[in-house]
Design a protein with these regions (language model features):
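Conserved donor-binding/catalytic core segment of Leloir-type glycosyltransferases
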Residues: 212-232, 239-240
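Membrane-proximal helix-turn-helix segments that form the acceptor-binding/catalytic region
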Residues: 89, 93, 119-123, 136, ...
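Nucleotide-sugar-dependent
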Residues: 230-233, 283-288, 295-321, 327-339
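Nucleotide-activated donor-binding/catalytic signature segment of Leloir-type glycosyltransferases, i.e.
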Residues: 258-293
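Carbohydrate-associated surface elements
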Residues: 176, 195
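A short, well-ordered alpha-helix in the C-terminal region of glycosyltransferases
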Residues: 371-385
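Acidic anion/phosphate-binding donor-loop and adjacent secondary structure
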Residues: 196-213
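N-terminal subdomain of nucleotide-sugar transferases
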Residues: 1-60, 242-247, 416
Length: 416
């Protein structure tokens, strides 16, 4: 079968899809919105999709009997390949049944998804594009209850090398990850920003009343999203910086809109002075972002996976930029996030884990109206790169182009 000759829906394999509210599910929903037919294949056995016209939803989760075998740590390689074989059969069945023209395999919380999609695509004779929401090789270094750390560290690089050798193309969210991957694969790589609906934010910005910028009033910093190891120490340090500011007579309150509970966050060192709110739906998150005085964009400084932090592009980045609010980036200096903010002048960057330093950054935003104006203008200018319409069109174009980029197909050892 020659790639590019088929006419049929695209299939997307992911551990999370709408109506989930996390960044990956929201981004996929935006990229594929209005472009049916589409086949969505979820590896989450608890996924309960909502019916969407033109969209076919199926679960390809691993059954209990196979999952139970993961306890046999002495034969993890065999068990992993068993997981890949089973999931690949489910994906292949869907590809053939629905006459799919290609499949997009997303990195994420389930390490089996990517190799299983590669195997299924080979068997079905369709191209497979990898969507790197994060660096797949780095994800093998994150502790995972399904597999032992020792086995993951030994096998992650070789498994990634094989899937990259068989991919028809790779989608990445930023330049730094593209540069890293260019050294590991000859497949075409394109940058697709995590998209945002710019006209929605324009409407929200226009509906807000004029702000009173008195340094002596109470100011708000907002963060919308998950908080785990990848953000935790940066969020904690920001909260401590606000205590420093109170000693200087500046009242700033941190508001976290997150799925993590207040008790859980406090147990991890987030002070009780922080206002913790339940996670909100995308439209409500947009309002929160536009109404905040300052937006916090954190990435952790001390983690077990620094390479993942270095190349990370948070799904909310485009939303923050489109809000036009001053953005406080608290992230390591070598991270894509810090580099991007500095290069395009849209964020105040604090790249040291020091409460006095972040207090100084916040104080500058509060006291300097010209700085706030420059940050807002820079954010709005940078947000155009995240246009939902532009990135959706580029995504569709890349999927069509990679359908003509044929790899020399050979028997895969991933499921052998």
């Amino acid at each position: 079968m020659v790639y590019g000759m088929m006419a049929g829906p695209v299939a997307v394999v992911s551990h999370t899809l709408s109506p989930d509210l996390n960044g990956q599910a929201v981004v996929l929903g935006r990229l594929f919105e209005g472009t049916p037919p589409l086949v969505r294949l979820s590896s989450d056995r608890f996924w309960r999709p909502q019916a969407i016209p033109g969209v076919i939803d199926e679960r390809v989760a691993t059954p209990w009997a196979i999952r139970k075998l993961r306890k046999l740590r002495f034969m993890e390689g065999t068990v992993f390949r068993m997981h890949v074989r089973h999931r690949a059969r489910g994906i292949e069945r869907a590809l053939v049944q629905h006459r799919c023209s290609s499949v997009v395999a997303c990195t994420g919380g389930d390490l089996v998804d990517v190799p299983a999609a590669i195997v299924a695509a080979e068997r079905a004779g369709v191209p497979c594009v990898l969507h790197y929401f994060d660096d797949y090789r780095s994800q093998w270094k994150i502790p995972n209850p399904a597999w032992s750390t020792r086995w993951m560290e030994r096998n992650g690089a070789s498994i990634e090398a094989e899937v990259l050798s068989k991919a028809s193309g790779v989608v990445v969210p930023n330049e730094l990850l593209k540069s890293d991957l260019a050294e590991r694969t000859s497949s075409p790589i394109t940058i697709i920003r995590n998209p945002v609906q710019l006209d929605l934010y324009e409407t929200l910005r226009g509906s807000l009343p004029a702000r009173e910028y008195n340094p002596l009033r109470c100011w708000s910093i907002a963060y919308t999203g998950s908080i785990y190891e990848a953000q935790l120490d940066a969020v904690r340090n920001c909260a401590r910086g606000l205590d420093v500011l109170r000693g200087r007579g500046i009242d700033v309150r941190l508001h976290l809109y997150t799925a993590q509970s207040e008790a859980s966050l406090q147990a991890q060192g987030i002070p009780d002075s922080v206002h913790v709110h339940p996670t909100v739906k995308p439209l409500d998150a947009s309002r929160v972002q536009c109404e905040a005085d300052i937006l916090l964009l954190p990435l952790a400084f001390v983690t077990r996976y620094p390479e993942l932090i270095r190349t990370s592009a948070p799904g909310k980045l485009g939303e923050y930029l489109a809000s036009g609010r001053p953005i406080l980036v608290h992230a390591p200096t070598e991270s894509f996030l810090s580099r991007f903010a500095r290069d395009q002048r849209w964020g105040m960057v604090c790249d040291t884990l020091d409460e006095s330093q972040i207090a100084n950054c916040i104080e500058r935003i509060v006291r300097e109206p010209q700085l706030r104006a420059e940050l807002s203008q820079g954010a709005l200018a940078a947000s155009r790169q995240f246009s939902e319409a532009v990135n959706r069109e580029e995504y569709s174009r890349f999927l069509k182009e990679t359908a003509t980029f044929r790899k020399a197909l050979r028997s895969s050892s991933l499921s052998a």
